[in-house]
Design a protein with these regions (language model features):
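Alpha-helical transmembrane segments in inner-membrane proteins
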Residues: 1-210
Length: 210
């Protein structure tokens, strides 16, 4: 038992070191290649520290969060093919972000940086609330009822996003498309810290309960 624990710990440390290496390499690649020697220059250091590094770290965080959500869904449905979008939660997030992009709203200056993040969370919470109400109303249906509800919500949100894409202008459509493709172009240290404060505790609790 102790031997297995030590082996798992070594594997974990090895993967962690490889991940750190990939983060450093990823942050140095791009249209402007940045070496460790060039970091002595303030201009290169600013690009590496304030533009590239937040994007790479956010990509790592999002990857971990999606993997955690996938594990939860697979455990919930007892199906290794289940994914985070199965219940329509991600579609609800995309729909609310689309609404925020196509029909801009006035927010206080302090919240402008987090606008899309706020709308995405609101959209996901709305879908979660709808699914919860459906499960309470039709509890006898079990997981099949939840699955069918998720398929219906996915279809409705997809249709609504299609309508938003039709009424939006070229710039709005491009912005929505980039967001749905997982663009990290707007990643900054403040948004990374907010995302980490939500995602990291969820991943830790999930690992602890596993």
């Amino acid at each position: 038992m102790l031997k297995d624990s030590l082996s798992s710990f070594r594997v974990f440390i090895g993967l962690l070191l490889r991940l750190a290496t990939l983060v450093l390499v990823g942050a140095s690649q791009g249209a402007l290649k940045i070496t460790f020697a060039s970091l002595q220059d303030a201009h290169y250091r600013d690009i590496w520290l304030n533009i590239r590094l937040p994007r790479v770290l956010l990509a790592v965080l999002v990857g971990g969060a999606l993997a955690t959500a996938g594990v939860i869904m697979q455990g919930l449905f007892r199906n290794p093919m289940a994914d985070p979008g199965l219940l329509g939660v991600s579609s609800g997030s995309a729909l609310m972000v689309g609404v925020a992009i196509i029909f801009p709203v006035s927010l206080p200056a302090a919240f402008l940086l987090y606008e899309q993040m706020i709308f995405a969370v609101v959209g996901s919470l709305v879908v979660c609330a709808v699914i919860f109400l459906i499960s309470l109303r039709h509890h006898h249906g079990g997981m099949i009822q939840l699955l069918l509800a998720g398929i219906a919500i996915n279809a409705l949100c997809g249709a609504a996003i299609g309508i938003l894409s039709y009424v939006g202008d070229e710039q709005q459509l491009r912005q929505l498309t980039l967001w749905m493709m997982g663009s990290l172009g707007q990643a900054q240290w403040p948004t990374l810290l907010v995302a980490t404060s939500f995602a990291l505790p969820a991943m830790v609790v999930t690992a602890w309960l596993a």
